[in-house]
Amino acid sequence: MTTNTVSRKVAWLRVVTLAIAAFIFNTTEFAPVGLLSDIADSFGMETAQVGMMLTIYAWVVALMSLPFMLLTSKVERRRLLIGLFILFIASHVLSFFAWNFDVLVISRIGIAFAHAVFWSITSALAIRMAPPGKRAQALSLIATGTALAMVFGIPIGRIIGQYFGWRMTFLAIGLGALATLACLVKLLPTLPSEHSGSLKSLPVLFRRPALVSVYILTVVVVTAHYTAYSYIEPFVQTVAGLSGNFATVLLLILGGAGIIGSILFGKLGNQHASGLISLAIALLLACLLLLLPASHNPQHLMLLSIFWGVAIMIIGLGMQVKVLASAPDATDVAMSLFSGIFNIGIGAGALVGSQVSLHLSMASVGYVGAIPALVALVWSLMIFRRWPVSLEDHQPHHS
């Protein structure tokens, strides 16, 4: 009995360490969102030019997720994770020392390579290391790590950047990763590769219209969100004319509201996922349309960011559940594709936002983001009516 209790404790420690790793990997992807103005100032550039760094990072992750997953499919998982972390930490050290913008971009590409592999293996690892009968809880812990990065990662990164300079934010993330690596080395057993997806499952997945339509919805709605969200920090300072501190508060509120979205989805997601996702997309559309009108009043901006945070968390969780339900037989490949497609949306949104800022005006990012949001809303209503029960049908077997 005692041994069993100890092994359960160790199993949970392993999963928690993976969840912390998920938090760190997601924090670094979005940290630049809160630091665009500072990085731009230090290199004498426009924020919209620096914003391209978000696009490059996201698209590297998108392009490399599947190839890297296949290339590393036979590698023992403990060794692979250690290698990933070494690349991740070294790249952050390079970010800290980046003597020009090109070097910073190169360091971010190194981080993106590590990110691409990490996300293609981490859900499967959490399931393998979970105590017996606790697979769903293990997955939700990883999702929580991811969600908390949105809630606290970006604002904490911004606060460190505000007080100690943006380079310290990247160094702090690298140090956090070093501590996590030490825990992983101590806790992880040898993990031979198993159940890795292969290219054989790709044609099968792409012949599932319900799954493909969810992928299309993902890329469109994520593009809408990131068109405005990527530039929220310079928007608050230049368009709304508010302080850098207020931008930090706004990012905290938006992230914190994600917890409400997560709880709502946990309560209602199994039965009403389709309706909940469409409702959240409608809410996102309203937030984007109201972004500029709300910018004249700090209270209105704070209220808007609560609804925005709830909406985007429900959308993110809902899409994952839909993908898993449509591909219970090939979760690794389906989720690797989902991660890639999500990142295509992040990159596209950041790119559109930067072009709008450069050629129209920063004030228009919400209105331009509302266009794909409207398309996503119409598309979601169409596909969930066409395939209404794909999620609920598979749910009992999958959980």
Curated annotation (Swiss-Prot):
CDD domains cross-referenced by the UniProt entry: MFS_NepI_like
The topology of this chain with respect to the membrane is: Multi-pass membrane protein
Signal peptide segment = none
Q: Record keywords: Transport included?
A: yes
Q: Which residues cross the membrane?
A: 15-35, 50-70, 81-101, 103-123, 136-156, 168-188, 209-229, 246-266, 273-293, 301-321, 333-353, 364-384
The UniProt keyword set, sorted, is: Cell inner membrane, Cell membrane, Membrane, Sugar transport, Transmembrane, Transmembrane helix, Transport
Query: In the record, what terms sit under GO molecular function?
Result: carbohydrate transmembrane transporter activity
Q: Which domain of life is it from?
A: Bacteria
A GO term from the CC aspect:
plasma membrane
Where in or outside the cell?
Answer: Cell inner membrane
For this chain, the family text in UniProt reads: Belongs to the major facilitator superfamily. SotB (TC 2.A.1.2) family.
Q: What NCBIfam families does UniProt report for this protein, alphabetically? A: PRK03545.1
Matches recorded under HAMAP family: MFS_SotB (MF_00517)
What does the UniProt function comment say about this protein? Answer: Involved in the efflux of sugars. The physiological role may be the reduction of the intracellular concentration of toxic sugars or sugar metabolites.
Name recorded for this polypeptide: Probable sugar efflux transporter
Give the organism, scientific name. Answer: Klebsiella pneumoniae subsp. pneumoniae (strain ATCC 700721 / MGH 78578)
- Name of the encoding gene: sotB
